[in-house]
Curated annotation (Swiss-Prot):
Induction profile: Expressed in the early phase of the viral replicative cycle.
GO molecular function: DNA binding; DNA-directed RNA polymerase activity; zinc ion binding
Subunit structure: The DNA-dependent RNA polymerase (vRNAP) consists of eight subunits encoded by early viral genes and termed according to their apparent molecular masses Rpo147, Rpo132, Rpo35, Rpo30, Rpo22, Rpo19, Rpo18, and Rpo7. The same holoenzyme, with the addition of the transcription-specificity factor RAP94, is used for early gene expression.
Biased composition (Pro residues): 226-236
Name of the gene encoding the protein in the UniProt record: OPG066
Disulfide bonds listed in the record: none
GO cellular component entries: DNA-directed RNA polymerase complex; host cell cytoplasm; virion component
Swiss-Prot/TrEMBL GO biological process terms: DNA-templated transcription
Zinc finger (TFIIS-type) in chain: 155-195
EC number from the UniProt entry: 2.7.7.6
Pfam families: rpo30_N, Zn_ribbon_TFIIS
Protein name: DNA-directed RNA polymerase 30 kDa polypeptide
Location within or outside the cell: Virion; Host cytoplasm
Length: 259
């Protein structure tokens, strides 16, 4: 691999041109061994170009400075991007990463894919220092199939249409905490969906006979042959008793007095 240099800076970063000519390999050799140097540079170049995220151009019109109390002001200013709904940290006044100060200064002086390349290098150096694998592609995922193998065709619910066990349960609708969710099963072979099976009522002859016998005894002990209670009389109308008098509107003529 040819030597990698950071040489493209913006016009307002002329003060960092001395750092731009620094060989990346000479800088990285201060932190990592030569055995991990080539792999780290190759990985950082690949990931920085593949997962590069374009920075959002912020202006004063869409940035709102948040206010903090003096007891919470620890030297870090926060900005809120109201247009893009983002909150991020900027202008750190507390010195961080003093061990990697040279590399951090290069990150601050660059932009674009070169900045992402240096950030990946810094991340990889820290992982190597801690003895952790920095390349996520080399990390083996833990298989929990022995414990949570819920999609095993051996135990799946068979499809009533094609009798296949290549089915998947899906939660269609969630409801309140005291109500069961709406669950449907989808068959991957015939592309049909069906309701989950329900438990059938288990009937035991002995239990049924015993319950019927108990019900007979209860009806013999407590017969319900008593006559119904008499109907209560209808309440008297308040108008008939003179409790409510007829009213009239003020625009109407007053009622004539009975002589």
């Amino acid at each position: 691999m040819e030597n990698v240099y950071i040489s493209s800076y913006s016009s307002n970063e002329q003060t960092s041109m001395a750092v731009a000519a620094t060989d990346i390999r000479e800088l990285l050799s201060q932190y990592v061994d030569d055995a991990n140097l080539e792999d780290l540079i190759e990985w950082a170049m690949e990931k920085s170009s593949k997962y590069y995220i374009k920075n959002i151009g912020n202006t004063k019109s869409n940035i709102e400075e948040t206010k903090f109390e003096s007891k919470n002001n620890i030297g870090i200013e926060y900005s809120k991007d109201s247009r893009n709904k983002l909150s991020y940290r900027n202008k750190p006044s507390i010195a961080t990463n003093l061990e990697y100060k040279t590399l951090c200064d290069m990150i601050k002086g660059t932009s674009g894919t070169e900045k992402e390349f240096l950030r990946y290098l810094l991340f990889g150096i820290k992982c190597i220092k801690k003895g952790v694998e920095y390349n996520i592609d080399k990390i083996k995922d833990v298989s929990y199939n022995d414990y949570f193998n819920v999609l095993d065709e051996k135990y799946n619910t068979p499809c009533p249409n094609c009798k296949s066990r290549n089915t998947t349960p899906m939660m269609i609708q969630t409801r309140a905490a005291d109500e069961p969710p709406l669950v449907r099963h989808a068959c991957r072979d015939c592309k049909q969906h069906f309701k989950p099976p329900k438990f059938r009522a288990f009937r035991n002859l002995n239990v049924t006979t015993q319950s019927i016998h108990e019900n007979k005894e209860i009806t013999e002990i407590l017969p319900d042959n008593n006559p119904s209670p008499p109907e209560s009389p209808e309440p008297a109308s308040p108008i008939d008793d003179g409790l409510i008098r007829s009213t009239f509107d003020r625009n109407d003529e007053p009622p004539e007095d009975d002589e």
